[in-house]
Amino acid sequence: MATKKPKKTTAKKRSAGSSKRVTAKPKKVAAKKERVQPKRKPGSKASKAGKVSGGKVKGQLRVRMYRIGFGDFFLLTVPTKIGPQHILIDCGVHAGDIKSMKACVQDLVKETKRNLALVIATHYHADHLSGFASNFDEFAQFNVGMVWITNRLDPSNEGASKFKAQIASLSSQLQLRLGARTDVAGQQALAKVQNALGIQLGTTKKEGDNEKALRLLTSGFKNKPPVRYYQGGQTPELPTVLKGAMTCELLGPAPLDSGKEFAGSDNKKEQYLAAAADQGVPDECLTPFEKHWPATSADYPRAAFREYRTEEQIELDQPGSPEALERLLRAAQPDVLLALADAVDGTLNNQSLVVLFTCQGKKLLFVGDAQWGNWSYWLYGKKVSGADPGISERAKEILASLDFFKVGHHGSTNANPIPAVAALNPKCAAMCSTESSDPDGKRPYGSIEKETEVPRIKLMDEMEKRTQSRLVRSDWIGVLEVKPSPEAKGQLAKLPPNFSKGDLFIDYVFPK
């Protein structure tokens, strides 16, 4: 018996010390859990809350908003049983660039150790993509679990690819026409067009920032992760390390065949304007565009078509053809160029992926730059005209349950509809990545006089009230040589509960 005892002890020690056996066991357990998990009842609490069943999660649920100027760069940290996992949502800046992008990417490297579970590119705008391009070599060293991109950029979709090419062609022509403008409105319109192209006027670069960013996202990361193209209503595939730790629902963009992407990038009735919406000129005067382009007085500023009369309406034999666009541009009055720039900007914004995460019972909504066409798809579930019929019960349920809201389009009035803000959970925390003034003290976009300033002051005030002062803006902190926005008014002297600031970012940690 004395000889058997040592054998038993040795066997135990060998079992504990063998890396092969220890590694094999967790793999089997993990595989078993993945097979069992989908058998949960859809209505069960664990399924709804996005909780990890069994074991102890490590880390805290946190959103980090990097301070890069007028653009989006968000890092969502998700606690899991194998430790914190990271989701990067957009990385770009355009107008209002405060030159902190490189430093922020280095902080991302330090925080994630070049490992990202998921990267999401919401839409094709430089202020959401340019950081990937300007830091291409750094990002090329990252290991990524999966990449999600709006399906409007899916190269296998012929219709989407054709429309993307048309937008690029129109943007290039607009860039040339607007390049000579020295007025503020013209320069802001030029900035919108360059945001769509990802390339500055007069540059010798053969590849724009947006295309370079797409190249990184689709094939440039170190481990060549799988890429998925999504639209609203689809059930996205989560990377393995996030399965069981969270759930995700895609609310936008509208399906490609719904027509709502082009139903209108604006709806002034749903905006935070001081006065009633302009009546403008009769709608029948405003139809020089093919049906893809919004063409009613609600979609364009009154001045955009001041030179038009019904009898002088432009007739196009083949709407949407390159020749038709050329003719339209040649005949365009200056304000029509501005309206076209707005249309390009709004159309790309409406292609934004709108992502609803649920983790540890908390709900987080990231809306990209979604404007009216995108919002109306899931707010109402049907085409809306005339009087507001009231948002759907499903939309009310989502908005009333939110614990975190990423303010749309940097605080623009055309991307945060009145009924959506009114339906927000009053205890919801909100972050707005924006820049109210560039280094010269000018606004990157819009004007207070025309009620188009970004961020829209009236909207920000309403968001403050609705969230009970749980709204924080990125331009409220100084970064590097850049001072806080004059609109900060000492807002960050005392941060709202669970917010904290670093040299380059603002964090929000969810209370347990």
Question: Where on the chain are the PLM-derived regions?
Answer:
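Active-site metal-binding motif and surrounding structural segment of the metallo-beta-lactamase
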Residues: 79-87, 94-147, 393-412, 426-430
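Long, intrinsically disordered low-complexity tandem-repeat regions enriched in serine/threonine/proline
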Residues: 22-23, 29
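Short loop/turn segments at strand-loop or loop-helix junctions that form parts
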Residues: 68, 78-79, 90-92, 149-154, ...
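Long, structured stretches of catalytic cores involved in phosphate-ester chemistry, encompassing
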Residues: 121, 130, 148, 367, ...
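Short, solvent-exposed loop/turn and secondary-structure capping segments
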Residues: 74-76, 86-89, 99-101, 130-133, ...
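Flexible, acidic/histidine-containing loops and adjacent segments that form or flank the divalent-metal
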Residues: 2-4, 8-9, 13, 20, ...
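Short, flexible/disordered intra-domain loops and linkers
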Residues: 96-99, 158-166, 439-454
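Conserved beta-strand hairpin/beta-sheet module of binuclear metal-dependent hydrolase folds
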Residues: 55-114, 173, 348-376, 430
